[in-house]
Swiss-Prot record:
Region: Disordered, residue numbers: 1-44, 71-91, 799-842
A Gene Ontology term for the protein's cellular component: cytosol
Official protein name in the record: NACHT, LRR and PYD domains-containing protein 1a allele 4
Site (Cleavage): F968, S969
UniProt feature, compositional bias: Polar residues: 1-29, 799-815
Organism: Rattus norvegicus
Ranges: LRR repeats: 343-364, 673-693, 730-750
Subcellular location(s) per record: Cytoplasm, Cytosol; Cytoplasm; Nucleus
Amino acid sequence: MGESQSKQESNTRVAQHGSQQDVDPTFQTKRALERERSSPQVEQSFLGQLQSLLGWSSTSKDVPLSQLIREMDHESRRHSHQSKKKLDRSEHISEGTIPEIYEKRKETISHTQSMEQKYLFQNFTKLLLLQKCCPGGSEKLVRESWHPCVPEEGGHMIEIQDLFDPNLDTEKKPQLVIIEGAAGIGKSTLARQVKRAWDEGQLYRDRFQHVFFFSCRELAQCKQLSLAELIAQGQEVPTAPTRQILSRPEKLLFILDGIDEPAWVLEDQNPELCVHWSQAQPVHTLLGSLLGKSILPEASLMLTARTTALQKLVPSLGQPHRVEVLGFSEFERKDYFYKYFAKERNTIIDFNLIGSIPVLLTLCEVPWVCWLLCTCLEKQMQQGEVLSLTSQTTTALCLKYLSLTIPGQHLSTQLRTLCSLAAEGICQRRTLFSKSDLCKQGLAEDAIATFLKIGVLQRQPSSLSYSFAHLCLQEFFAAMSYILEDSEEAHGDMGNDRTVETLVERYGRQNLFEAPTVRFLLGLLNTREMREMENIFACKFPWETKLKLLRSIIGEPFCQPCHLGLFHCLYENQEEELLTETMLCFPLTASGPNHMEATVFQTNVKRLVIQTDMELMVVTFCITFSHVRSLRLKGKGQQEYKLTAPAMVLYRWTPISEASWKVLFSNLKCTRNLEELDLSGNPLSYSAVRSLCTALRQPGCRLKTLWLVDCGLTSRCCSFLASMLSAHSRLAELDLRLNDLGDNGVRQLCEGLRNPACNLSILRLDQASLSEQVITELRALETKNPKLFISSTWMSHMTMPTENTDGEESLTSSKQQQQQSGDKHMEPLGTDDDFWGPSGPVSTEVVDRERNLYRVRLPMAGSYHCPSTGLHFVVTRAVTIEIGFCAWSQFLHETPLQHSHMVAGPLFDIKAEHGAVTAVCLPHFVSLQEGKVDSSLFHVAHFQDHGMVLETPARVEPHFAVLENPSFSPMGVLLRMIPAVGHFIPITSITLIYYRLYLEDITFHLYLVPNDCTIRKAIDEEELKFQFVRINKPPPVDALYVGSRYIVSSSKEVEILPKELELCYRSPRESQLFSEIYVGNIGSGINLQLTDKKYMNLIWEALLKPGDLRPALPRMASAPKDAPALLHFVDQHREQLVARVTSVDPLLDKLHGLVLSEEDYETVRAEATNQDKMRKLFRGSRSWSWDCKDHFYQALKETHPHLIMDLLEKSGGVSVRL
């Protein structure tokens, strides 16, 4: 019997924790990742894991592991080797380091501790955790689906070590932590992790002396227990006498896992009647007293329960910390697959299969579904089948699992019996069954043995009871039981009515659609799934039974608020007829006979809070069958546009995965009534834009308006947008503002706009950073196509939300700027070093050039962004900010993090008045495209007097990390490196080209460096010493890898030394790598190229023309305000400017709003000739400040560059103030 049980546990991959009997598949992996790593079978799987961790595409699959290892530096391999541990095969591996000291989500590493390198290695299944707000106590524990007004912030993401951190509002440490979430999402996994981490000395040792873990399903088997017996059950090994344990109740933590599973009512008894700790009492009374604080009021508790069960579970829970488990991130989903199939040679094939089906990848955010999918793939391998999964729902995946595991149809009768057992258990809230329970139900001994062997059932080793492998699996079998019963019912609708009554009695009408059993039931009533059931059970189901049962379950939900659970049920069902009938009956239509414009406060704009990829998928799937005409996915800092009713606004505060974007856009291929889509404020990767444009090109897509404001789009995305414009005739309005498209990107858009099939009538984009040539192309397009209106306002490249006086979120410098500017094509433009804010550019002052110190005086509350540095501040009032450029080498070498973290952005020393800055964006150069790097690996390092502090950013965007309510010191972004991966991190890089003319010979210097403003500035200053001038050319489009080598080549015979460039990070104070290129005669031009040395693919090229080569500009002289005798450049050359400026109107457009008022602007324009306009302009300039004349000079340089260059050469300098 023992041997059989051991074999059964091996086959079913049962993971157990001490006395815990409940199997959670998130602990179930096939083998430990590092077992026999040197064997040839493991090499391919280890390579697969590297590819999963880095998000490498399948094109890298033929790279030998040995070659990858050789390319990692010695230090990385040493760290990797030390950090790997051989784990029990039942544990799920998720490598990472957890610092020893935590304080409000920060880790402090003092200089003395840094030498010791006290890193604690953990192997946790990493889950997404959302700390939820609970302002009014626990009277509203369940998240509602519909919101009549704009919802408040939904909380913030935390990690396992933050569960007992003080409340941000009260600063009190919580005594009660509720771990909530959907079925199978990983609540029990998290609870076990807390216990195991405490056992291993990694978490909460300073707070708790004793931690007790209890499975409530097991506790429910006990009739009575004393407090002493309860404590004894919670310890694997007795550690101290009970009296000693109870002497310090504030040091105790009780973990109650699955407190909602048993059918008990936890009632707190009268404190005056409390019995002695050694006296037995009913278990539900004992637990109720613990929760009600009648006994051990100072003790802490952690509960796990499904979200829908919380409200009725305990009437009053005081002020708990509520943490919702959101499942796996996309990164962890892929990682799980690799670790499950650690030794299989087909690991890469499996990954490509799963990655190619984004719906499956989205479903796998639920850890239980991850296990289910991997089990199905494993069964297919064992049976020699071609690996193929086309399941679109969890129900379909469960049926696939059943068909792969049930050995033939001879067990169909016993399988029906097992379904009846499951349904009876669900109705009675029982998950453990005795041997007699199974026999009474009619299960034979051989059938029980078979179900144990294939893993559907499992035996509890600490008792004689049995359970299903997972509660969700029991609920699936229960759902099949209801269909089997209804198909056998001989009394017409009585079976349907009885089923619905049973479900309502068990779950309640309000939570009916949240119950997994009901979702499975709706999924089984799909035509395809019913055929699969017929094959499994060798029977036929009457189709009228299906239709009647569907309508009985759905009932009349249309008069009630829409439930997110109902969307889940409809998604599981997938029947178009039912979806259309149900969704068209929702009260989403406008109040009048005609469609009307709706603001966000109108009742016909519905709001729904979604937290996970799965929720986003099911909601957008169902919306395509409804009356909804406008859909907004609200991102951070998004401007509110008017939506056409009926409309829906989806609120989400957690990142959206690549797979989820693909699913969402796939749903848009046939939109029926949906005409407007607003994705503003949501970062879109290159692949996401590609999926979006693919959907928009489909004939069934009816979208007419698309808002993509501040989505992190680059010129690389514009090829897809242009192709979409050429093929999609319905799209009439496209908003691309606050995206860094550049000249190349806009030129690609112009190609799409020229296509006769393009029906676009309104295009909004920023033109402030575009060249005059591109702006001319846009104007020519408007002239050629009178129906096309290209709208532009000047504004910063990024925006962030600020709060107005009503506490509502608004977008700084967007709508207000549009009104101020009159929506002109050209707006005033400052230099790249300026900070762009609500009232225009704000100049940056040089405090000490040698020490790289600068100052900016922000004049009012709002959002300010500097394109040159990438810094972004949100301030509540006027404030002066000092900014210093620092070098990481000054600070990082004194900490142990130089081996575990890599520099991910520039280091700034920022000083500002405390409380004036509510948010700061710190730039980073790590590429987040394609989901290759997990954003949870980012930290912001603060270097303070007492040591270094690592802070977790509030969020990480494609180009910057956001800190809210920051404190300032030397600070910058770091990225935690994954052990054994080393420096294989994709980064955004730039090329810098400098030249020097000597007679007819030209010398070029070519650099390839990370996109770091401090490095760029250091190179600029070094090259200037030798009179080299920089040429601006576009950077590489694709992300590159640190440590990679590239071949420098040219279209002409030139001398290049060296001929290879390595992309590496060097501190700004160190010498940077470059190639020197000697050209005798440039002729008509020269083409420079960089080619990947390993894969020989072209990664960058640039054409250098003779027109790019101009004499070096003399350094601009500083002109302080107390030196009036020094004339400004525009005053020195007044006569020449009046005579030679040939195009005054563009010049006036640039000065309008900054230098010229509306009245001055019109007065100058009213003059007849250009010379008269210039004379009028100079007459008004007598009252201008030096700053105004600086703006005049900048405008002249933009509109008449050749004239300004000629004047500079003749005068030998220019007097403006930097």
